[in-house]
């Protein structure tokens, strides 16, 4: 039985069908528009195996989002520096993901905690079609160090399982997408535990799906590697709320992977 390779198939798709485009960073990309991948979270945890994905960074960043943070210091204190290139001299990023998830401003001066409302609505009205969180706040885009790439996500409950679909407007397929897959898969598993459901599917939908010109050699190297089975995720305790998880609550079991492949970040 062959191992499913939706991510590697996406890389091949971009290489085969992409159009050369200029981009904001001046790097240049090979790009396709409108692609989708599906991952069955009831069977495994989709941590890409054809190169190493640093799970600690994935988890710390997600916990940082859930804290509603805008400064990189908390992540740096955990040994994670993935946002440093976009922060100002004080470590600030503006009203990025955490603010929009936890404290979306309202016209009357109040704030909406989208994550808290999501959890409550999943419990009280699981069949709703409004289990949505948006980070794309048009009124505050100009104040963000980087407008949201993974901008909008929706949850769906059926047969005792919680599924998630993410819309990612801009997808750095080599560096960013493996991280994003793992992050939203982890969030789905955490939410499922909190609301008494089992993990279902994670559906990744991409808008501008691209490989940067200076990542081509790395992608070709990665695609020569044989994939391994995905690992399993264990959540070691159930905290009082979605906001009370720590890094020590997560264990990835059986993660067999090829070595890291380094590549420059387009800032």
From Swiss-Prot:
Instruction: Note the SS bond partners.
Output: none
User: A single Gene Ontology molecular function, please?
Assistant: thymidylate synthase activity
List the EC numbers from the record: 2.1.1.45
Give a yes or no for keyword Cytoplasm in this entry: yes
Give one Pfam hit by family name.
Thymidylat_synt
- Active site: which residues? 149
Coiled-coil intervals:
none
Uppermost EC category: transferase
Where in or outside the cell it occurs: the entry states: Cytoplasm
Q: Where does dUMP bind?
A: 24, 129-130, 169-172, 180, 210-212
Q: How does it assemble?
A: Homodimer.
Its recorded name reads: Thymidylate synthase
Q: From what organism does this protein derive?
A: Arthrobacter sp. (strain FB24)
Q: What is the lineage of its organism?
A: Bacteria, Bacillati, Actinomycetota, Actinomycetes, Micrococcales
Q: Which gene is the coding source of this polypeptide chain? A: thyA
């Amino acid at each position: 039985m062959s191992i499913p390779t939706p991510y590697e198939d996406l890389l091949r798709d971009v290489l085969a069908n992409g159009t050369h485009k200029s981009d904001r960073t001046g790097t240049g990309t090979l790009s396709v528009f409108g692609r989708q991948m599906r991952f069955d979270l009831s069977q495994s945890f989709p941590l890409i195996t054809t190169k190493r994905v640093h799970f600690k960074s994935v988890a710390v960043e997600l916990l940082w989002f859930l804290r509603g943070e805008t400064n990189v210091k908390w992540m740096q204190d955990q040994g994670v520096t993935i946002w440093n290139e976009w922060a100002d001299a004080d470590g600030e990023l503006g009203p990025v993901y955490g603010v929009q998830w936890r404290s979306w401003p309202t016209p009357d001066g109040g704030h909406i905690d989208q994550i808290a409302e999501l959890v409550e609505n999943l419990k009280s009205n699981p069949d709703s079609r409004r289990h949505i969180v948006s980070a794309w706040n048009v009124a505050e885009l100009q104040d963000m160090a980087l407008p949201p790439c993974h901008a909008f996500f929706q949850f769906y409950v059926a047969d005792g399982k919680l599924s998630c679909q993410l819309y990612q407007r801009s997808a750095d397929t080599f560096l960013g997408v493996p991280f994003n897959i793992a992050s939203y898969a982890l969030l789905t598993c955490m939410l499922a535990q909190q609301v008494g459901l089992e993990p279902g599917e994670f559906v990744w939908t991409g808008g501008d799906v691209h490989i940067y010109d200076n990542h081509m050699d790395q992608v070709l190297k990665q695609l020569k590697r044989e994939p391994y089975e995905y690992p399993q995720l264990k959540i070691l305790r159930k905290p009082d709320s979605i906001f009370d998880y720590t890094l020590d609550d997560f264990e990835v079991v059986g993660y067999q992977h090829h070595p890291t492949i380094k590549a420059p970040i387009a800032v």
